[in-house]
A protein has these predicted regions:
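N-terminal post-signal-peptidase region of extra-cytosolic proteins
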Residues: 21-31, 58-82, 100-105, 128, ...
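Intrinsically disordered, low-complexity
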Residues: 20-64, 167
Length: 167
């Protein structure tokens, strides 16, 4: 009986070690984040293959970001360039908006492009449950995930990773 219990223990331990190893390998292989606004999806990518997908919430207004304060989520190619722990939204990762095209459009329109577009979790709000925020577009132009999903993305995506935001 002891031998059987020990064998079960060893198998469990090996299974845990394997899952931890494969998670670390998956995390190390994310080379792109793809957001498809029309699908409300964020995809973690490795060599053009989707590794994992998440539902997201976007800016309150549809269409590409035009100027500061328009409550739209930008569209284009950017990078995740820094991260922080946020008092309001738990974990957050900065998206390098505006890019050169955004700056050019801004100069042509005479309106500031804005900035501080983040990939972040849901608010620390006692009045509304977390699932509520994942059912609608509520941000000022950022991309929001549930806090557990944001934690996974935080662990999987390195600073400097490309993020493409499509319509």
């Amino acid at each position: 009986m002891r031998v059987l219990c020990f064998a079960v223990f060893l198998l469990s331990l090996m299974s845990f070690a394997n899952s931890a190893y494969s998670t670390q390998n998956t995390i190390a292989t994310i080379d792109k984040v793809l957001v498809v606004k029309s699908e409300r999806k964020l995809h973690l990518m490795h060599r053009d293959t989707v590794v994992k997908s998440y539902r997201v919430s976007l800016g309150k207004k549809s269409g590409p970001k035009q100027y500061e304060g328009d409550q739209r989520t930008p569209e284009g190619i950017y990078a995740i360039n820094w991260r922080k722990h946020s008092d309001n939204f738990n974990l957050s990762m900065h998206i390098s908006y505006p890019n050169a095209k955004d700056v050019q459009r801004s100069q042509e329109s005479g309106l500031p492009p804005g900035g501080m577009i983040m990939l972040h979790g849901t608010p620390n709000d006692e009045e509304y449950p977390e699932w509520f925020f994942n059912t609608l577009d509520w941000t000022e132009g950022c991309i929001a995930l549930t806090n557990p999903d944001m934690k996974e993305v935080w662990e999987a995506v390195q600073d400097g990773t490309l993020i493409e935001i499509r319509p």
